[in-house]
């Protein structure tokens, strides 16, 4: 096990899958960052309005709006949150460049603005793009992150 990063970004799918499936690697990551217990957070977790809206939207679609509210409440109450604002100009430039898939620009900019050391996502396409083209942070699937840092 390596020294764990001080600041990480967790993609929408990590929150949704982790909250829905207690046996998943995503759930293990959420437990590690303190999602289930107030005051237990050691690591800083980067979030933005865009990420929180995605979590709420997906949770509402999969279950209901109450579950979405519960997830957001746990993020704000239990995690050591680093809230960042996204730069509209940078968003537009990335959209025009085509380097990062359009639907993933917001999550990328969130991790970048928060100076995350790690980016964790089940989105394999996004991880490959970020790792190959930007190299700004270590990119992991939830399984890779658990194996690298939590075992």
Describe each region flagged by the PLM.
Residues 2, 117-118, 124-151:
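Acidic, PIN/NYN-like endoribonuclease modules and their adjacent C-terminal/linker elements
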Residues 33-94:
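PIN-domain endoribonuclease scaffold, especially VapC-family toxins
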Residues 21-22, 58, 133:
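Residue-level signal for well-ordered alpha-helical positions
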Residues 1-47:
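Short, well-structured N-terminal submotif of metal-dependent ribonuclease cores
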Residues 10, 49, 120-123:
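Short His-Asn-centered micro-motif
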Residues 81-119, 128:
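Active-site neighborhoods of divalent-metal-dependent phosphate/nucleic-acid chemistry enzymes
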Residues 14, 51, 106-107, 125-127:
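Alpha-helix capping/helix-boundary segments
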Residues 17-18, 54-55, 127-130:
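Short catalytic/ligand-binding loop motif for oxyanion handling, primarily in non-cytosolic enzymes
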């Amino acid at each position: 096990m390596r020294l764990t990063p001080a600041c990480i970004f967790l993609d929408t799918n990590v929150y949704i899958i982790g909250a829905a499936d207690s046996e998943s690697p995503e759930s293990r990551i959420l437990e590690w960052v303190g999602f289930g217990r107030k005051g237990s957070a050691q690591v800083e977790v980067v979030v933005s309005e865009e990420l929180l809206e995605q979590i709420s939207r997906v949770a509402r679609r999969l279950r209901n709006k109450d579950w979405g509210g519960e997830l957001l409440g746990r993020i704000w109450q239990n995690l050591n949150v680093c809230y960042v604002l996204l730069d509209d100009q940078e968003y537009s430039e990335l959209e025009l460049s085509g380097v990062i898939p359009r639907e993933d620009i917001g999550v990328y900019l969130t991790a970048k603005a928060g100076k995350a050391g790690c980016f964790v996502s089940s989105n394999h396409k996004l991880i490959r793009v970020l790792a190959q083209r930007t190299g700004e942070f270590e990119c992991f699937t939830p399984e890779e992150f658990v194996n690298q840092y939590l075992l």
